[in-house]
Amino acid sequence: MEKQAVTIYTVAREARVSMATVSRVVNGNPNVKPATRQKVLDVIKRLNYRPNAVARGLASKRTTTVGVVIPNITNPYFAELALGIDDIASMYKYNIILANSDYDNDKILKVVRNLHAKQVDGIIFMGFDLSEELRAEFKSSSTPVVVAGSVVNDKELPAVRIDYRKAAKEAVARLLDHNHDHVALVTSSLGYSINGDDRLSGYQDALAEAGVQFDDQLVIETDGSYKQIYDQAKALADSGVKAAYVTNDHLAVGLLNGLTDNGIKVPTDFEIISSNDTTYTRLCRPMLTSISQPLYDIGAVSMRLLTKLMEDTDDRENDVILDHSIVSRQSTRLQ
């Protein structure tokens, strides 16, 4: 005989209280007498009752669910951010809906609309710039949004990040200090604010401070693929460039392998500094010098900020900038 599911009605009947009282106990409402609360909890334990999250949401107008929009679930950069998000979500009793967007604007919009339809309490957005449709979708909803580990083209959205402009400036300055007059910037799309505004500006800041004239021919914009920069590596070195600051680790490994496979030694003939310090930087040889971002902390702080927004507390910052560093490895000299 099939075992009947234990419902809130079952608990109320066994405890001889109303379903409203059981609901208040389950949702942590303080307006229940201690003796009554304990009686309900004892029945819940004895019957092994598992409250239905959707039903609880209908009662409290909250679903205790957060949507996380991630561009590429296999990318270690976003995976580390997600780990920090998940740990804090668990601490505050929130469930996570993880949605992969594949860097596709149409899919991102569909994903966000789906999360809104599921009535999530908040959204953490990992990715780059917002399309006009997505911006309108965010603004038309009362659901709070936090941007994690990036810069987008909507400064009104709360964000947790490092100072990407300052970090880029420090990386390029280090390469310039190694007597390189021709330092390239290798980047994915400059259409993304994080690259076209912050990192490009940091690159130009370092050049200006060192008295080196900016040459737009040294800004190598790619489609973000490993293959494209791998194929361009030899031509870049042959053009007289002796060092490059690269905006993500995937591209940096492509550049490194392209140089190495063409007999160009790193760091003897060419130096590289990358940006994210994911596992990619330590799995290649030589290992890559990189800007180090506290990715786990960025994810964790993003989730904590979102909890404050969802609870509408006053003690919150809308733009949180965490510290970064540069980790020296084998792709640069003078470690």
Where are these regions (language model features)?
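Conserved functional loop/turn residues at catalytic and ligand-binding sites
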Residues: 10, 16, 21, 30, ...
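Short beta-strand segments enriched in small/hydrophobic residues
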Residues: 14, 19-24, 58-74, 174, ...
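Alpha-helical recognition/docking segments in bacterial nutrient-uptake
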Residues: 1-7, 61-173, 177, 232-239
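N-terminal helix-turn-helix DNA-binding module of bacterial transcription factors
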Residues: 1-64, 333
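Bacterial carbohydrate/catabolite-sensing allosteric modules
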Residues: 1-2, 46, 87-92, 140-147, ...
